[in-house]
Amino acid sequence: MHTHARKIVQGFVHGQLSLIHAARRELWCAAVGAVMGGHWLSLSRLARALMGQGTQKAALKRVDRLMGNPRIGQEARVACAALLRTLCRGGQPLVIAVDWSEVAPGGVFVELRASAMRSGMGRGLTIYQQVYPESKLGNARAQRALLKTLHRWMPAGVQVIIITDAGFRRPWFTQVERLGWSWIGRIRAGVCVSREGTHWEQA
């Protein structure tokens, strides 16, 4: 199972991310393979998984250089854009779930994440994630940045459905509609809704 999955990852990385330096592509594949094999996403655990015939010190340096590379953030966005384009093939509607969540217990940081899925997929694949201070939870500017990025990456003609949990407000849904996309949103108890031209009613 892991061998087959690694081949899929390698095929995607080498086929879609050819502009990324070859050495980093190889290390990307090795690191992703290590995580898929059950190793924790930490510098020391990844280094142990990548030791091979070398020393742990050398493996630590490799992983540290990858994590500390100033280009890795931009290259991660390139990878997410390529993944999104891959998911858009076949003409099926693309469902994108957007939500805010805590990065870790304690609530110091929060993450705005978008996960894409289509018919036949077991679970969504993360295509966008950005970390903010907890004070930015629900921030409208951060949410606009997400939509702007996804729209820039999205191939023309794709039917998109955005799904959100409670907490997203009317301006968000208006922005989604302006992009020509559909949306589904969960609302909290006590919220009133209205079809255009009708009276407000409690949902």
Where would I find each of the regions flagged by the language model?
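Electropositive nucleic-acid engagement tracts
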Residues: 4-8, 12-92, 148-149
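Extended, highly charged
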Residues: 1
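Short, conserved catalytic/metal-binding motifs centered on acidic residues
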Residues: 46, 95-102, 124, 160-169, ...
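Intrinsically disordered, low-complexity boundary segments flanking structured domains
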Residues: 80-86, 113-115, 172
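An internal, acidic/charged active-site-proximal segment
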Residues: 129-203
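Short active-site-adjacent helix-start/loop capping segments
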Residues: 71-74, 104-108, 171
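RNase H-like nuclease fold core
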Residues: 56-58, 62, 91-154
